[in-house]
UniProtKB/Swiss-Prot annotation:
Localization per Swiss-Prot or TrEMBL: Cytoplasm
Quaternary structure note: Homodimer.
Domain of life: Bacteria
InterPro entries (alphabetical): PRA-CH (IPR026660), PRib_AMP_CycHydrolase_dom (IPR002496), PRib_AMP_CycHydrolase_sf (IPR038019)
Organism: Mycobacterium marinum (strain ATCC BAA-535 / M)
Residues reported in the UniProt entry to bind Mg(2+): 80, 82, 84
Family, similarity comment: Belongs to the PRA-CH family.
Keyword Ion transport among record annotations: no
Keywords, alphabetical: Amino-acid biosynthesis, Cytoplasm, Histidine biosynthesis, Hydrolase, Magnesium, Metal-binding, Zinc
Protein name: Phosphoribosyl-AMP cyclohydrolase
Stated role: Catalyzes the hydrolysis of the adenine ring of phosphoribosyl-AMP.
Pfam families, per the entry: PRA-CH
Length: 111
């Protein structure tokens, strides 16, 4: 797969070629998680509507829910004004967090 050159030209990546993905639940508006993407992960996400991310620790792409069954069906992808973050709007099946929680932001409230 190859990311559309017009989209690729707008992206601002870090030194590792990655950019941030913020994931929001379509129905509730809850922020579910933040992850990393590379061009190929974004391209796969756009073409399949399966949320695909890049794992820095494993050095590879991963499709959300491929092993856990906690999938994300992508309804929209938006690029922010700086080009360094995308916002995915998804239908979440199961927990979005690796802990099994619905969102990665269910923990301690700081303020």
């Amino acid at each position: 797969m190859t990311l559309d050159p017009n989209v690729a030209a707008r992206l601002k990546r870090n030194a590792e070629g990655l950019f941030t993905a913020v994931v929001q639940e379509r129905g509730s508006g809850d922020v579910l998680m933040v992850a990393w993407m590379d061009d190929d992960a974004l391209d796969r996400t756009l073409k399949t509507r399966e949320a695909t991310y890049y794992s820095r620790s494993r050095g590879e792409q991963w499709v959300k829910g491929a092993t856990s069954g906690h999938t994300q069906h992508v309804h929209s992808v938006r690029l922010d004004c700086d080009g360094d973050t995308v916002l995915l709007t998804v239908d979440q099946v199961g927990g979005a967090c690796h802990t099994g929680d619905h969102t990665c932001f269910d923990a301690t409230v700081l303020l």
